[in-house]
Amino acid sequence: MDIIGGQHLRQMWDDLADVYGHKTALICESSGGVVNRYSYLELNQEINRTANLFYTLGIRKGDKVALHLDNCPEFIFCWFGLAKIGAIMVPINARLLREESAWILQNSQACLLVTSAQFYPMYQQIQQEDATQLRHICLTDVALPADDGVSSFTQLKNQQPATLCYAPPLSTDDTAEILFTSGTTSRPKGVVITHYNLRFAGYYSAWQCALRDDDVYLTVMPAFHIDCQCTAAMAAFSAGATFVLVEKYSARAFWGQVQKYRATITECIPMMIRTLMVQPPSANDQQHRLREVMFYLNLSAQEKDAFCERFGVRLLTSYGMTETIVGIIGDRPGDKRRWPSIGRAGFCYEAEIRDDHNRPLPAGEIGEICIKGVPGKTIFKEYFLNPKATAKVLEADGWLHTGDTGYRDEEGFFYFADRRCNMIKRGGENVSCVELENIIAAHPKIQDIVVVGIKDSIRDEAIKAFVVLNEGETLSEEEFFRFCEQNMAKFKVPSYLEIRKDLPRNCSGKIIRKNLK
């Protein structure tokens, strides 16, 4: 069954421009307070100019282009401009450092990069020291370094016509994006997302929050994450609504932005809710038009009730991951909600709780949350150039193993129990314990290392490192944290260090993480 009517992203934007014309499609607010607005017609023209820019730089169907950007209009232009010519977006987490960014460049096979001046020195170093296929860089800032192979994105874009010059044949099965996501292995995996995936995500997420064309969907979530792209942007655009993209989250500014743009839908993670609750109470706390607050794990009942009562909102719980594209389990429009349930399986999906032998479990028993969808349509297609990893989580008949544990009740409501093995959830970011352990193990004074997540009142979990030193060595906290800051993204740097004589292990030699907190 073709739910999206065979419509790829190029056709979507041409149709949206025709149908909604001068209606506001996108509002972007920078951290400095600069606001840019685009109608559906204007946004489609900017997307076409960007597509033409890429074509003039030699980008063709199937080529990969990396984006290392904070939330900005250029991210939207590039995302859909690439899709219009059949090229593939590779978004890079804007918080990543040199080694991590270089690894994604190498393993995505990206040949062009769009970034800003603040990240340019890092990529200049990557070009000099790492083997990549990168042959050109576009900077979104006006000022340009005097280097070959570097262009001004804005200047080149503004020289292009507003009609598309290169329109190769497209299929909804074509890859639109490769999104690298943290896994339980030492390196992230590239989640392959098709035109169909993104079109379906728009319709599905719009259904989930009953979105209409008079809605305003505001998000502060980073554009390089799946939730911003599929739960927010694709939903808003698919419904002809207005999408408000704020560059960075500020607890002090958030409610003012909600009120200023008359937002009717927004999304929050627990860190946001906790930081909003510590702001001074205001008579304007409930002066807004919010109908739904899309919410993602994990919050206590007391925190949830206090937030909803103070701000006069209700939470729409949604559970998913990059591989599921959308929140495949969640609350439904017009349906009852059962906190702390994460909801019920959405349309086009099946969900089961399975035991260690991959057998379905009855209601009330804890096991692995498994989801059935259609690869490349309602769930991800595959991991890029990694068939072994794909086969490990995705069965031939479409059952996806999430690695998360939970249970369901007799009415089909699901409940989340625990995170995937060896993953830490920190302020909306997934952090791989194995990745951090491999980095820290390179320190010459460290013999053994394990990192775990511990409860944090603001950011869900903090990162704690337990280390065993080589005989005769000493290691100060200052030296340890400086090493971490130099070798990993800021959000991955542990908050706590404990030096031990040994680490607890079971009879097979595996570290017993539950004994370390």
Swiss-Prot record:
GO terms for molecular function: carnitine-CoA ligase activity; crotonobetaine-CoA ligase activity; medium-chain fatty acid-CoA ligase activity. CDD domains: FACL_DitJ_like. GO terms for biological process: carnitine metabolic process; fatty acid metabolic process. It catalyses: 4-(trimethylamino)butanoate + ATP + CoA = 4-(trimethylamino)butanoyl-CoA + AMP + diphosphate; crotonobetaine + ATP + CoA = crotonobetainyl-CoA + AMP + diphosphate; (R)-carnitine + ATP + CoA = (R)-carnitinyl-CoA + AMP + diphosphate. Pathway: Amine and polyamine metabolism; carnitine metabolism. It comes from the Bacteria. Belongs to the ATP-dependent AMP-binding enzyme family. This is Crotonobetaine/carnitine--CoA ligase.
